[in-house]
Every structure is written in C-alpha cells, then in structure tokens.
Curated annotation (Swiss-Prot):
HAMAP family for the chain: Proteasome_A_A
One Gene Ontology biological process: ubiquitin-dependent protein catabolic process
Subunit structure comment from the entry: The 20S proteasome core is composed of 14 alpha and 14 beta subunits that assemble into four stacked heptameric rings, resulting in a barrel-shaped structure. The two inner rings, each composed of seven catalytic beta subunits, are sandwiched by two outer rings, each composed of seven alpha subunits. The catalytic chamber with the active sites is on the inside of the barrel. Has a gated structure, the ends of the cylinder being occluded by the N-termini of the alpha-subunits. Is capped at one or both ends by the proteasome regulatory ATPase, PAN.
GO terms assigned for molecular function: threonine-type endopeptidase activity
Cell compartment(s), UniProt: Cytoplasm
Its biological purpose: Component of the proteasome core, a large protease complex with broad specificity involved in protein degradation.
Keyword Kinase in record: no
Regulation: The formation of the proteasomal ATPase PAN-20S proteasome complex, via the docking of the C-termini of PAN into the intersubunit pockets in the alpha-rings, triggers opening of the gate for substrate entry. Interconversion between the open-gate and close-gate conformations leads to a dynamic regulation of the 20S proteasome proteolysis activity.
Gene Ontology, cellular component aspect: cytoplasm; proteasome core complex, alpha-subunit complex
Family of the protein in this entry: Belongs to the peptidase T1A family.
Keywords for this protein: Cytoplasm, Proteasome
This protein's record includes keyword Membrane: no
Protein name from the UniProt record: Proteasome subunit alpha
Length: 260
C-alpha cells in the first residue's frame, strides 16, 4: 500500500480546511500569482497609472497583439498576474457587470462596487465543489469621485493601495515604492516610479517588454503610454540607475583605499 501523506485529503479538497486552518488550493492559486509576470500600480492626486511586464516568449509573436492591461470600462482598467486564462474570465465578468450597472443606473459603475463583485466570484470558487480557485490576481484601477487602486487576491480578499505590485517581482517593486513614494507625487513622477519599479524586476528591461496605461480625473478615460514616451522614460531611468551604480562603486573603492 502506497504511503499517503497526512495532509493529502486537505490538499485535494477545495472546501476542506486543514487542521491549521488553511485551504491548500487557495495557497496554490497564490503561488501561481507569485510566479506570474509583474504588474504595478501607482496612484497620485489626480490619477492612476498601471505598468505590466509582457513576457514575450518567442520572437515570432507580434508584441502589439500581446495586451496585458485590459479595459473594463472607459474609467476602469485591470492588470493581471498569474494564469492569464483565469484572468481573462475575470476581466470578461467585470466588463459584463460594468455594462449591467450602466444600463440599470445610467451611470458608470463605481470601482469599489465592481471590485466587490469580482471578489465575491473569487471567494465563491473557494467554497463550492466542482470548481477551483482562480489562479490570478488583478490590479483594478480607475477614477470616479477620486482615483482608486485595488489589489484582488485569489481568496476573494481585496485591498486599496497608494502603490502596489503583484507577481514574481512584488518584493523588489514594493521595496522601491516604500523608498520613493510620497503622497504629493505628480503624474510624471508617478509614471516614472511605476516604470522604475517594474524595470528593477526585469533582467533586461525594454520598451517592447513593458506596457503602461494611465487615467486622469480631468479626462476619465484610460490612455496607453505611446512607445516613444515609454522609451524616453525608460532611457532616463536606466541612465539614473547606471549613475547610481557608478557612485556606489566609487564609494566602495574609496573605503577600500582608506583601509590600506
């Protein structure tokens, strides 16, 4: 008879808690997010910016066809990490809910309402048999009365942030936000900070491998950052990073000289 680990039953069942209070399938869904492409969001007084990593695995793929920032409504967008097929289902559901709200009430859906509906769906997939948790997290951002930025977890939990990252580069990006984010940040600095945080998580950051979109309170419509502007921001950031590395090396050498 094959040896069966004690936790095997809890491991396979979606709706059964382990003795220490965990749902293993939810934890595994979170692991899918941790291995996914990095996505970041930064909020400023009058808007929000999203930036995502585009993992283009073949030179034959058309980069322009590989979208990672999805428009939900004119004023709301989402950036996923994890299993993109799962994220697509959530995005389609969010679009449907946004249309239903607009037809019912004659006005754009508040982001908080939409986030709660999506997280209700996610939570339901941790509670019933015959389904599995969504292996995707979403950054959902937009403007109504004010700019808003939310992270949705595979468990159905959600959090509002000033600046946040999901995916494999979360820890690196969050450390950069902790160091550089400030409450009075403006549009240009917010876009630059988002690109900086994302670039720091990539081995070889390029404009082709990054997608950026933003929205402002004035226009209340999402815009993708043009390729030329993205390259300009990225070149400035890479040059600043290079100069910082040179300064650090010089400091190290000066300390070395003092020791001899």
């Amino acid at each position: 008879m094959a040896f069966v680990p004690p936790q095997a039953g809890y491991d396979r069942a979606i709706t059964v808690f382990s003795p220490d209070g965990r749902l293993f399938q939810v934890n595994y869904a979170r692991e899918a997010v941790k291995r996914g492409a990095t996505a970041v969001g930064v909020k400023w007084k009058d808007g929000v910016v999203l930036a995502v990593e585009k993992r283009i695995t073949s030179k034959l793929i058309e980069p322009s066809s590989y979208e990672k920032i999805f428009l939900i409504d004119d004023h709301i967008a989402a950036a996923p990490s994890g299993i993109i097929a799962d994220a697509r289902v959530l995005v389609d559901r969010a679009r449907l809910e946004a249309q239903i709200y607009r037809l019912t009430y004659g006005e754009p859906v508040p982001l908080t309402v939409l986030v709660k509906k999506i997280c209700d769906l996610k939570q339901a997939h941790t509670q019933y048999g015959g389904v599995r948790p969504f292996g995707a997290a979403l950054l959902m951002a937009g403007v109504n009365e004010k700019p808003e930025l939310f992270e949705t977890d595979p468990s159905g939990a959600y959090f509002e942030w000033k600046a946040v990252a999901i995916g494999s580069g979360r820890n690196t990006a969050m450390a950069i936000f902790e160091e550089h984010y400030r409450d009075d940040i403006g549009k240009d600095d917010a876009i630059k900070l988002a690109i900086l945080a994302l670039a720091k998580t990539l081995e070889e950051p390029t404009a082709e491998g990054i997608e950026v979109a933003y929205i402002t309170m004035d226009e209340k419509r999402w815009k993708k950052l043009p390729r030329e502007e993205l390259e300009k921001y990225l070149n400035e950031i890479l040059q600043e990073v290079k100069e910082e590395e040179v300064e650090e090396k010089q400091e190290d050498y000066s300390e070395l000289d003092q020791n001899y």
